[in-house]
Curated annotation (Swiss-Prot):
Cofactor note: Binds 1 zinc ion per subunit.
Name this polypeptide is given: Queuine tRNA-ribosyltransferase
Pathway: tRNA modification; tRNA-queuosine biosynthesis
Binding site for substrate: 89-93, 143, 187, 214
Gene Ontology molecular function: metal ion binding; tRNA-guanosine(34) queuine transglycosylase activity
GO cellular component, one term: cytosol
Region named RNA binding: 245-251, 269-273
Binding positions for Zn(2+) per the UniProt entry: 302, 304, 307, 333
Catalytic activity: 7-aminomethyl-7-carbaguanine + guanosine(34) in tRNA = 7-aminomethyl-7-carbaguanosine(34) in tRNA + guanine
Organism: Photorhabdus laumondii subsp. laumondii (strain DSM 15139 / CIP 105565 / TT01)
Domain of life: Bacteria
Keywords annotated in UniProt: Glycosyltransferase, Metal-binding, Queuosine biosynthesis, Transferase, tRNA processing, Zinc
Cofactor: Zn(2+)
Family under the similarity heading: Belongs to the queuine tRNA-ribosyltransferase family.
Amino acid sequence: MKFELQTTDGQARRGRLIFERGVVETPAFMPVGTYGTVKGMTPEEVKETGAQILLGNTFHLWLRPGQEIMKLHGDLHGFMQWHGPILTDSGGFQVFSLGAMRKIKEEGVHFRNPINGTPVFLSPEKSMEIQYDLGSDIVMIFDECTPYPADWDYAKRSMEMSLRWAARSRKRFDELQNKNALFGIIQGSIYEDLRDISVKGLVEIGFDGYAVGGLAVGEPKEDMHRILEHVCPQIPQDKPRYLMGVGKPEDLVEGVRRGIDMFDCVMPTRNARNGHLFVTHGVIKIRNAKHKEDTSPLDEQCDCYTCRNYSRAYLHHLDRCNEILGARLNTIHNLRYYQRLMAKIRQAIEEGNLEQFVEDFYQRIGKPVPALSI
């Protein structure tokens, strides 16, 4: 992987990630394909929304179908028939989500398989091996996603262990002679001094990109913004920056304003299945009775397959009848909305008028522009 930084506007960056499997224009949004599928979508449909890179889930694909079945197809690309780049998370967040089912120790994490209850062990080394078999274009180190709230002492212990796990991840990745990219993950909760130690430690180990982890886990937005403003300037300029698990359209805008290049989130797909649809002026809840007789498209400005062909009334009807097609059409629209948003952000950075774009964006959705302290 090669990262080209083309231009900046304030802290915002316009660049490209270049892989053998294709180019990703940044800032980029990555749809989430947890089980080797973006729910309800074919790879061709996902590509048509404008997505250039997907996120796959190491933890879930390891438990089912497993590494051996993946290897029968070559790797995850061959298995799911997505021929662009894939980033895989390391399993750290899923382990964090298991709560009482897991036991975190220095060597790794012991937990019960949520599918059948059998004991399982995941370590930094094992995560690197699974991601190698998946053929991930971007591999994430294995870390502990520090929960929120966490006091300073717990956050410090967690961050320090994540640093040791980062070094072990790097070592195993290199032993496997993996030619793809490996990203470090910055932890430290909402504490700037802990984030400083984490960034410094990761940069010393050396990675192809750096992710900001442990945000969007329940902390106030002001804390997320403050941490991004503090951390991003410390990340080497020539490396891509990835904000994990974020987020709402406003979160993407705010991340870009603070120097983030990459995002992923289940929000567009999950919200689509629940009838929450993103449009130019905010959010439409298609379940509401007011859409029952509305012959207009979801969004006059959207060029997606759904908006070109179907009315709000039809989408309301599909939702009320619990039809699978409704979830699919909603997902196509929401993913296209996110890709259109990123394309407009990239254009605004190129033209040097991102702050004007930000002002217009918030005006349309009826919210104030968050303060920028950087």
